[in-house]
Amino acid sequence: MPQLNPNPWFFIMIISWLTYSMIIQPKILSFTSTNPPARKEPTTNTTTPWNWPWT
């Protein structure tokens, strides 16, 4: 079974992940968020019950 032979694909997978980890990921993480998260207090919704006319 050729899937079990790690020679052709294992090296490519390792090189791909190293490329992602060393080059692409720091560039992506250097961007600042345009909308930084802010701490907000949760609001409770005050709703009035609906009176159905047929009950």
Curated annotation (Swiss-Prot):
Any Pfam family matching the protein: ATP-synt_8
Gene Ontology terms for molecular function: proton transmembrane transporter activity
Membrane topology listed for this record: Single-pass membrane protein
GO cellular component, as recorded: mitochondrial membrane; proton-transporting ATP synthase complex
Spans traversing the lipid bilayer: 7-24
Biased composition range(s): Low complexity: 43-55
Cell compartments where the protein resides: Mitochondrion membrane
Keywords from the UniProt entry: ATP synthesis, CF(0), Hydrogen ion transport, Ion transport, Membrane, Mitochondrion, Transmembrane, Transmembrane helix, Transport
Gene Ontology biological process: proton motive force-driven ATP synthesis
InterPro entries hit by this protein: ATP8_metazoa (IPR001421), ATPase_protein_8 (IPR050635)
Region feature (Disordered): 34-55
UniProt keyword Transcription regulation, yes or no: no
Protein family according to the UniProt entry: Belongs to the ATPase protein 8 family.
Subunit comment: F-type ATPases have 2 components, CF(1) - the catalytic core - and CF(0) - the membrane proton channel.
Function: Mitochondrial membrane ATP synthase (F(1)F(0) ATP synthase or Complex V) produces ATP from ADP in the presence of a proton gradient across the membrane which is generated by electron transport complexes of the respiratory chain. F-type ATPases consist of two structural domains, F(1) - containing the extramembraneous catalytic core and F(0) - containing the membrane proton channel, linked together by a central stalk and a peripheral stalk. During catalysis, ATP synthesis in the catalytic domain of F(1) is coupled via a rotary mechanism of the central stalk subunits to proton translocation.
UniProt-recorded name of the protein: ATP synthase protein 8
Gene that specifies this protein: MT-ATP8
